[in-house]
Design a protein with these regions (language model features):
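Class I SAM-dependent methyltransferase SAM/SAH-binding core
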Residues: 46-105, 131
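C-terminal helical/coil "lid" or tail adjacent to the Rossmann-like core of SAM-dependent
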Residues: 7-9, 174-178, 182, 214-274
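Class I SAM-dependent methyltransferase Rossmann-like catalytic core
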Residues: 1-46
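Core SAM-dependent methyltransferase catalytic element
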Residues: 208-211, 274-286
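Residues lining the SAM
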Residues: 113-120, 149
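A short glycine-rich, Lys/Arg-flanked "PGG" loop and its adjoining helix->strand segment in the class I
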Residues: 130-142
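A short acidic, Gly/Pro-enriched loop at the edge of an enzyme's catalytic core
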Residues: 103-114
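Conserved catalytic/acceptor-binding region of the Class I
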Residues: 141, 145-233
Length: 286
């Protein structure tokens, strides 16, 4: 199933704005930085940084503040979650753009760093992301970096990780309290999110001509492990009406699993999170 642009209105609500802000600070805590430590932006004149599918624009705002000498650009198919323009840093420009559309001419070969995060949903219907990846690569300067942040979607039963308040009482939560894993698989299947394609992003980076490619995987640290769980719970709850409209049976199953997830946490002290993955590659110097 391919989700049309007008259907994204569900993601432009106040609850989603709050969830996305929460998500941003959880991810920032992973490396205490917005930009992966392997990326070196020193000694780059006319530094330009872009974030695509920016949502609430927090990543771009913070990067613009961290790099006041850089020109930062943020884009999305809707600007509805962004702060008012007068509140944005002077070195941050925003515009409406979908990465399924042709790349603006002025963006070809323009950026030292291009960032995108958690964009599997628009590729519903098991769409191949490689044509979009080629656009991203075309937007990089020679020597420019692409940072693409996702969860480690493939084999969700192996990449869901758990934490229990009482490991003696609950020694194998991935077996006894796996409602989170089940709802994860159900959502991936119903929306036909292309998990296998996204699992191969590092290979696709290399095939697209990027070098120094690495997929940096990291378990959420204790400081934000429960926060990642709470964010996942909020996302599932927000997806329920859409899921129910697509498949009533899947919607009902998801509701029951969501109730079990809450019981797992509140009663048994078991929380689940997903392995995060930062895929980084660099365009060769000419």
């Amino acid at each position: 199933m391919v989700i049309a642009n007008d259907e994204y209105s569900i993601w432009r609500t106040a609850p989603d704005a709050s969830r996305l802000c929460y998500q941003h600070f959880c991810w920032r805590e992973l490396y205490k930085s917005n930009i992966h430590p392997s990326i070196d932006l020193t000694n780059r004149p006319n530094l330009r940084i872009a974030e695509l599918a920016t949502g609430h624009c927090l990543w771009a705002i913070q990067v613009a503040e961290e790099y006041p000498h850089a020109q930062v650009e943020a884009s999305d198919i809707s600007l509805g979650l962004m702060p008012p323009k007068p509140d944005l840093p002077a070195n941050l420009a925003v515009r409406k753009w979908s990465f399924f559309d042709p790349v603006p001419e002025e963006w070809i070969g323009a950026f030292d760093l291009l960032h995108v995060r958690l964009v599997i949903q628009p590729f519903g219907g098991n769409q191949d992301p490689r044509s979009v990846l080629d656009k991203f690569v075309s937007m990089l300067k020679p020597g420019g970096y692409l940072q693409w942040d996702e969860y480690d979607y493939h084999n969700a039963d192996k990449n869901n990780v758990y934490s229990a308040n009482d490991p003696v009482l609950v020694p194998n939560p991935e077996v006894t309290h796996n409602s989170s894993t089940k709802v994860w698989k159900l959502i991936m299947k119903t929306f036909q999110w292309p998990t296998e394609h996204f699992d191969r992003l590092a290979d696709y980076f290399s095939a697209a001509g990027l070098t120094d490619v690495a997929a940096h995987k990291k378990r959420p640290p204790p400081a934000v492990f429960r926060a990642f769980y709470e964010h996942w719970y909020a996302l599932v709850a927000q997806l329920l009406p859409v899921l129910d409209s697509m498949d009533a049976g899947a919607g009902q199953e998801a509701k029951e699993l969501l109730m079990q997830m809450k019981k797992d946490a509140v009663v048994d002290g078991v929380y689940s999170a997903h392995i995060t993955k930062f895929v980084v590659g660099r365009k060769p110097e000419q």
